[in-house]
Amino acid sequence: MNCYASHNYRDFSHAGNISKNFNEHIMQDMGFKNVALRQTHFHNKILGFFATLAGVCVIPFRLHKGDRLVLQYPIKKYYTFICKMAHIRGAKVITLIHDLGCCRRKKLTPQKEMKRLGNSDALIVHNNNMKRWIEEHGYKGGIAVHKMTDYTADAEAAVHKYDVGKCKILYAGALSRKKNAFLYELANSSLNYDIELYGRGFDASQIKSKNVHYHGFMSDTQLISENNCTFGLVWDGNSIDACEGAYGSYLKLNNPIKTSLYIRCHLPVIVWEQAAIAEVVKEKGIGVCVASLQDIDKIVAEITPEEYDKLEKNVIEWSKELKHGNCTRNAINQCLEYLK
């Protein structure tokens, strides 16, 4: 039996929860069975804790020899326990990685993180950069590359028309100064394009530029169906000249889910040239890679309607893959093949 373990999700405004929920639906469609308790949505932390704990406790009793269990990582507190119990029951474990704590929040050392992940028989990683990092840190099991996070939201993108010299760039996600200080630098810059900000945590009183507009939080489905932007920006950190700091440098390993959201919006993306996701952006022809945000002025000035139409056509084709969950399906099937 192929199976997965659901748990409590407090809300779906957090990128990690959105992605995990999409993956659960993809696995259900692939015929996977949930061996934990049903998915719950308790906002109360105590209720959520006990709902997840109860689900973890039933997992060992529902596993059998030869089963393949997919876990979405990180799992607070229970990951190692679930892996060990699965192996005792004769099951194999596939771990689908969403975040590496040792590289993002630095709460774990690489050694501790790899010790945990060493309990898994196979891993699904974001990209080739993360695959190399995992291998260099000693992992010996099978590894499949996710390529890009699927985004299966049931929404249809708005129709976009490219007007020369009238570029609107969408930036959606966490907007706090701690994670994205670069936004405050943009908010005080003279720009030849508009920046449309969607999300929580931005101090709009700091906006001095007439080209930066803060819209607050909007649901992903509404953003997909209603935005009228030209590009989606994938950038983190404290500088407009490079993705720096803990969050910025993490882009060298991480595939931000906002990239997939922009693709579902039918927006070509602008990404940092050193970001791991740049490999897929170039391969699929779905955007442009820049060294600095100061390069955007040149892009806006030089891109032709024909060039934009070609990017958008590629984006629309790739959007179909993400909506149907094909990246996740392919990666899981690779791991299942490895575990035969």
Which ranges hold each PLM region?
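Conserved catalytic-core segment of nucleotide-activated headgroup transferases in glycan assembly
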Residues: 152-225
